[in-house]
Structures are given as structure tokens and as C-alpha cells.
């Protein structure tokens, strides 16, 4: 659970794991172990992934008072821009940088970045959900109907209900604005 997070209070992250020499951190800035776990499961299929039904970690690094005056946004921007230089259109980096741009009010910069990330993203999964959620947020001021479509597509992805809370709440808000709820 992301205490104080403005956009999505729940995230599904792989942070609790059994010690194994093949599991390592990857990706810039928002480190994760998912890539190495996929490789490990291919090589050693006897391993199983456990899913916590309740939030296992309370993270408070996104509270506004903690972010104010920090260089967290600059570090995120630099890491994601460098990653996109190496892998243009990478869905993970596009989603993270797109979210940052939206939080800074740069929706017009975020939209093409997120659309490009979606073109290179598979048909399911957390990255696609995050791209669609952020694209919906970016489109809301200029094209609320298109934003509604993004939220609906995001909700078609089979994710834990808590993880999809952002799309659910934003879809409900847009439908209320349109008088359709």
C-alpha cells in the first residue's frame, strides 16, 4: 500500500522473496525482480510465486511532504529517459515517465509517450494496465470519452481488485461527469 500516493494507492510489487542466487534487481529507478524470477521459473519450474491477499508492505515514500524538495522526480526522469534512449517505446519506462509527466501537468507530452508504449506492450499485464490508466488520466481534460475507453480497457486486464482501483475510481468519476452513472 502506497501511503499518501495521489494516483494509485495499491501496487503489486515483487519485494518479498526467498533468497536465491538467480534473483536480482533490474530496471532503473523502480527496481524489481520480476525479470529474473521469470527466467528462474523457466529454468527451475518447481518454484511457485505466492500472492499476498492483504497489503504486505506499507510504503510512505510518496507522501507529498516527503516528495517536496527531494530530487526523486528528477532521478526518475533521468533514469526513464536514459532507459527509453536504449529501448525506445519500452512499456515499463513509458508508463513510469508518462505518470511523472502527468503529475507535472504535462499531459500533451505524456499522451504520445504512453500511446507508443502501448503499441509495444503485450495484451495483458500490469504494464499495460499502468499505460492505459495513465493515458486515461492524460486524456481526461481534452477527450473524456477516450479516457473512459482507456479505463474500460484497463479493467479488462485480470488484476487484483485493489491494484485496479485507480481505473475503477477514474472511470466512475468520468461516468458521473457525463451523467452516465
Which residue ranges define each predicted feature?
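Start-of-helix register in tetratricopeptide repeats
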Residues: 92, 126-130, 163-166
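Structural motif corresponding to the intra-repeat A-B loop/turn of tetratricopeptide repeats
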Residues: 104, 141-142, 178
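Catalytic-site signature of metal-activated, phosphate-bearing donor transferases
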Residues: 1-105, 109-112
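Alpha-helical positions within canonical tetratricopeptide repeat
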Residues: 109, 146-149
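Alpha-helical junction/boundary sensor with strong preference for TPR arrays
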Residues: 2, 87, 121, 157-158
Amino acid at each position: 500500500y502506497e501511503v499518501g500516493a495521489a494516483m494509485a494507492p495499491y501496487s503489486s510489487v515483487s519485494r518479498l522473496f526467498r533468497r536465491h542466487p538467480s534473483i536480482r534487481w533490474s530496471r532503473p529507478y523502480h527496481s524489481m525482480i520480476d525479470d529474473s524470477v521469470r527466467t528462474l521459473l523457466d529454468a527451475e519450474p518447481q518454484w511457485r510465486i505466492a500472492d499476498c491477499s492483504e497489503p504486505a508492505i506499507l510504503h510512505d515514500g510518496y507522501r507529498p511532504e516527503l516528495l517536496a524538495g527531494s530530487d526523486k522526480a528528477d532521478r526518475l526522469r533521468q533514469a526513464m529517459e536514459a532507459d527509453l534512449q536504449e529501448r525506445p517505446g519500452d512499456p515499463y519506462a513509458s508508463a513510469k515517465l508518462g505518470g511523472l509527466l502527468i503529475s507535472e501537468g504535462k499531459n500533451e507530452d505524456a499522451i504520445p509517450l504512453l500511446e507508443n508504449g502501448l503499441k509495444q506492450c503485450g495484451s495483458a499485464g500490469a504494464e499495460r494496465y499502468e499505460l492505459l490508466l495513465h493515458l486515461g488520466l492524460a486524456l481526461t481534460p481534452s477527450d473524456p470519452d477516450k479516457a473512459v475507453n482507456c479505463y474500460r480497457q484497463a479493467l479488462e486486464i485480470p488484476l487484483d481488485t485493489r491494484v485496479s482501483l485507480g481505473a475503477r475510481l477514474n472511470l466512475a468519476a468520468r461516468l458521473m461527469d457525463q451523467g452516465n452513472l
